[in-house]
């Protein structure tokens, strides 16, 4: 049965320790009615404090689900790759202390910085080698590792699918962000259909859209890979076909968590309950 989740990232500046802070966000997520919560890197995501996240989740009665971290495995130098793999493994240790069952790590920040052979296929062997070693290590700690469709370079459905198959490890799958395919100018529901068999975790996100031929709309908008304009929206408020994508995942047999990752400009204390209500409605379609 699919359960609801929210990313600490969705709380924006409220997750700062001068505001609600990480532990306060955990309480607020539970008050809003989410089944689970996931985390981005913060002041508590280290070996000294990670256990406090687990303890707070147990105290309020919400499940710690996932930990999202940065990473760059597109490194040709073997020593550099080895160093980055070691660093990400150390974050797997942190994830274990947090009590989460999944870890999403970035795989690349872009193509090789040279004038030839710079494409995704050139970087893929290095990324796959590193991701495979991390997946193997995390399996021993009971943590599933994932790649997410974000960051432009590894964002298209076919690229992400190619990466997962290149890694070829049972402990490595996809965090499918249903809105992020728009950043690569793809049709979200079609791309979700490609990625559904690999889904280990899901981010629910939506965007407003303006064609790149128009004038820049202003603050809060950013460019897709081909120059269209996007702005974060509540689930169902944008044009990202959120309901259809959720239905595709539901019909595929996915039964994990669906996590709200809100990037809009509205007040989060209003936006997140609204997003949760829409997610629950869409799951019933």
Question: Where does each model-flagged region fall?
Answer:
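Acidic-and-aromatic substrate-binding clefts and catalytic sites of carbohydrate-active enzymes
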Residues: 13-18, 39-50, 72-82, 111-115, ...
């Amino acid at each position: 049965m699919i359960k609801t989740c929210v990313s600490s990232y969705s709380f924006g500046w409220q997750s700062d320790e001068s505001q609600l802070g990480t532990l306060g966000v955990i309480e607020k997520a539970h008050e809003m009615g989410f089944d689970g919560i996931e985390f981005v890197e913060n002041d508590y995501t280290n070996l000294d404090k990670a256990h406090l996240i687990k303890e707070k989740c147990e105290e309020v009665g919400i499940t710690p689900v996932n930990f999202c971290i940065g990473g760059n495995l597109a490194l040709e130098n073997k020593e550099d790759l080895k160093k980055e793999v070691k660093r990400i493994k150390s974050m797997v240790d942190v994830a274990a202390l947090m009590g989460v069952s999944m870890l999403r790590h970035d795989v690349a920040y872009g193509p090789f910085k040279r004038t030839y052979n710079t494409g995704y296929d050139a970087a893929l062997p290095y990324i796959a080698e590193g991701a495979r070693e991390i997946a193997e290590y995390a399996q021993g700690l009971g943590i599933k590792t994932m790649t997410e469709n974000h960051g432009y370079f590894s964002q298209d459905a076919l690229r992400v699918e190619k990466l997962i198959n290149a890694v070829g490890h049972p402990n490595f799958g996809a965090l499918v962000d249903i809105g992020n395919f728009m950043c690569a100018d793809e049709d979200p529901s079609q791309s979700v259909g490609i990625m559904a068999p690999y889904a280990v975790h899901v981010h629910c996100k939506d965007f407003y859209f303006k064609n790149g031929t128009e004038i820049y709309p202003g603050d809060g908008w950013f460019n897709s890979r081909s120059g269209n304009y996007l702005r974060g929206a509540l689930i169902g408020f944008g044009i990202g076909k959120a309901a259809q994508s959720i239905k595709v995942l539901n019909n595929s047999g996915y039964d994990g968590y669906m996590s709200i990752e809100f990037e809009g400009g509205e007040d989060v204390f209003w936006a997140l309950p609204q997003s949760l209500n829409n997610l629950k409605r869409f799951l019933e379609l």
